[in-house]
Amino acid sequence: MCSSDLGPLALHWAAVSRGQRGTDWNTHCAQLAQLPDGQLWRAHQAGDLPRAADGRATLDPVKLGQLVRANMGKRGFTYTHWKDAESIQWVRHANQWGFRVNLSADSIEEVDTLMAHQAGPVVVVLPPDARENFRTPGGHRVVICPATQREDITCASCQLCQRERDTVIGFPAHGT
């Protein structure tokens, strides 16, 4: 179950669905463009990059382009489960233009597959007791998310997910 289905995040998203919070895509991108240069920000606390406008099971390249444009000079990042060939191509472009899109692997084996695309950084969810860095069967280094390991490190102070990197970030599963 996704963490956005429970607790405070679920309450927030219910209000968004009722139209009590949030805004439309174009306004959202315009607001992001107004952030100061160099500003670190994360997109999509829950959910994913938008689906193609024609309903195909691929990300929407126009909306991704708007997000990339809004991010110019900033340090935005997100995560995606869009892994079809077309999406991989657009993720590669977004990363080349400085909007960091982390490809989310569903298994250690998939890490190696996604890394082979060379479209951008990769992350993976690990068992809850994962504490040691390791290498995948394909030899890719997986580093346990520092913010999950030390109380004095936060996403804002670490910033590893926003960096261009060859290292995979592993997130130990948590919650219910």
Task: Mark where each language-model region is.
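C-terminal accessory extensions appended to soluble enzyme cores
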Residues: F134-T176
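Short cysteine/histidine-rich metal-coordination sites, predominantly Zn2+-binding motifs
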Residues: A14-T27, G170-T176
